Regions:
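Generic structural concept
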Residues: 132, 136, 168, 172, ...
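A glycine-rich phosphate-binding loop feature that marks nucleotide/adenosyl-phosphate handling sites
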Residues: 71-73, 122-123, 157-162, 196, ...
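Basic, alpha-helical terminal appendages of large translation-related enzymes
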Residues: 180, 185-186, 195-283
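Short, charged, low-complexity loops and linkers
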Residues: 92-93, 118-129, 149-160, 176-186
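Short, solvent-exposed segments of well-ordered alpha helices
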Residues: 4, 122-133, 162-165, 181-188, ...
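Conserved, charged catalytic cores of large soluble enzymes
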Residues: 20-22, 26-28, 139-178, 198, ...
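Residue-level signal for cytosolic alpha-helical hairpin/rod architecture
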Residues: 87, 120, 171-176, 232
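Structured secondary-structure scaffolds
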Residues: 1-148, 192-194
Length: 283
């Protein structure tokens, strides 16, 4: 009827269900709907929390299990605006630093439900601190020592000491903690839990100093390196949704064929592979 037009949001909202097979592929639609999380910007909350549920209920379609409104990225303390010229092009960041570090920063820095501030200074600080110093450097230390002292073969862990058991137990409980945080949309806290574990493993390496221990007790040093390597593998698996490309490189470097989140999947005797620095430090 040429006398009537469709409200643009009415037409747009329907795409959420038609895109996953509504009225076209029942099996596909049933596998996707109702969605667990409907993540939207806070500026379109009314559209998604009032109009959309009304449309679904009138059609007899189940509502999303939750609707979560995220905040805005600010440039410093101001909303990004072309007229102000304070817009950062994420593609430029990706060209300079890679997509995974950008993904990591955005998910680590934003508290979902609140606005977050972007500055190049905070991006570089987060990259160097978390990724270059903590995560990437741990892989470099472990792989270098194994290649130098164990013919690049993952050493046998042998019998665990108390400090080893602590790393193992923390690693085993990590996935359940992460699952709870993600279910509550606390992604930044979930990422920080993993990074805290990586920092704990770095301290474990410092306390045991396998670069010194290997000169006196090669078996004991091998145990330390196995524990640290397995903790790295587990951390990479948990971080893979955030940084799929870089964690894949790490897992390949460790010859880790298993992405299971249970402990002890590194296979002694497997040969480590050469790799480029995982996160070259930004000068």
């Amino acid at each position: 009827d040429s006398d009537y037009v469709t409200y643009v949001w009415f037409d747009a909202l329907i795409n959420y269900i038609t895109a996953v097979g509504f009225k076209e592929d029942k099996d596909q639609f049933d596998s996707w709907w109702p969605v667990s999380y409907h993540l939207i910007g806070k500026d379109i909350l009314t559209t998604h929390a009032v109009y959309w549920p009304t449309m679904l209920l009138s059609a007899g379609i189940q509502l999303p299990q939750s609707i979560f409104a995220h905040g805005w990225w600010l440039m410093g303390e101001s909303k990004m605006s072309k007229s102000l010229g304070n817009v950062i092009n994420p593609m430029d960041l990706i060209d300079d630093y890679g997509v995974d570090p950008v993904r990591y920063y955005l998910m680590r820095e934003m508290v979902l439900g609140h606005d977050s501030s972007f500055t190049m200074e905070s991006f570089i600080q987060r990259y160097n601190s978390d990724l270059a110093n903590d995560f990437g450097n741990l892989l470099s230390r472990v792989s270098t020592l194994i290649k130098k002292n164990y013919d690049a073969r993952i050493p046998e862990p042998g019998d665990y000491l108390e400090s080893d058991i602590q790393i193992k137990m923390k690693g085993e409980s990590l996935s359940s903690q992460i699952e709870i945080l993600i279910a509550d949309m606390r992604l930044n806290e979930a990422i920080e839990e993993i990074m805290q574990y990586i920092r704990t493993v770095n301290k474990y390496m410092e306390d045991n100093a396998p670069w010194k221990l290997v000169k006196e007790d090669k078996i004991a040093a091998g145990r330390v390196l196995y524990i640290a390597g397995e903790a790295l593998r587990l951390s990479a698996v948990l971080l893979s949704p955030v940084m799929p490309h870089r964690t894949s490189i790490l897992l390949d470097a460790l010859s880790a064929r298993d992405t299971d989140i249970s402990w002890g999947k590194l296979i002694p005797g497997d040969i480590l592979k050469d790799h480029e620095p995982l996160f070259p430090r930004i000068k």
